[in-house]
Amino acid sequence: MVFPHIVIDETSLFILLGEISHYYQDALHAFPVLPTQYIDFALWQHDEIKSHRIQAQLNYWKNHLACAPTLSSFPTDKQRPDFLEQAGQTYSTHIDQSTVKKLREISKQYEVTIFMTLVAALQILIHRYSKQSDIVIGTPINERKHKETENLIGCFVNVVALRTKINSQHTLETLLQDIKQTSLKAYENSDAPLQTVISHLNVKRNYHHAPLYQVMIYVQSEELVIKLPDVHYEMIPAFTDTSKLDLTFYILTHHPEKFVLNIEYSTALFEASTIKKIANDFIALLENIDLLLPKKIEDFACV
């Protein structure tokens, strides 16, 4: 089974696999009919756009992204074409057990999530590569905030832009707390759809880069599992030869002993060898994050 993201989100896959497992073991007992369908959510979301609540969120994004850079300065191997096609590849590696343990301990110590710690490391990586101090990246957020949507299959994901202003005189500890606050505010204001935010900001669209951000991070914390007695199955990652953005960092954190790191990249901009180096530098940052936390950002030598 293969599904495009526009049709189904990660939570929907959990629901679908659960239903397959149920009917495989007990085909006679159907699930109750859901009182709410996806079209009800779509209509509600459409009507909500005009509400004071969404307008307030749009104003937040307008202030948060005011004068933000529209194009990342992350160096590429090839000149950006006038029309950037979505051809891409995925480089896959992993983050080892000792580093995973360290990341979990640091996140607990500083009262942040693993996601926030990974975002901080990625922002440092981008800063070191691009020399930019004002950085915007995208990240998807689960929009199942209402009980009625808990068991629905569909796409309940919105993408938000996380903006970080890096002061090289500050420590990574300070940056981590800044990212915590930025992430929490982004979640509070995540009901405003990305396309509505882009229109509200009057962002000019073009064919050679995505609006607002060109780098994304996606952290998946749960493993897709289906329980089928006496049946052997295997989940196979379905990498496609496409990339909607310059770089997308997919990090799977559900395994207790290692994290999987997949970097999807535009082959119109990057060589495979460069992506391997980027991955190694990112992992090196994570491996040494406990030593870097009290240091000034300008003193980092990870790239």
Where are these predicted regions, by residue range?
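Adenylate-forming
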Residues: 2-6, 18-26, 39-50, 59-67, ...
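Receiver (REC) domain switch/active-site region of two-component response regulators
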Residues: 12
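Glycine/threonine-rich helix-loop capping motifs at alpha-helix boundaries
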Residues: 27-33
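A Lys/Arg-rich helix-loop hairpin that forms a DNA/phosphate-binding surface
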Residues: 33, 290-303
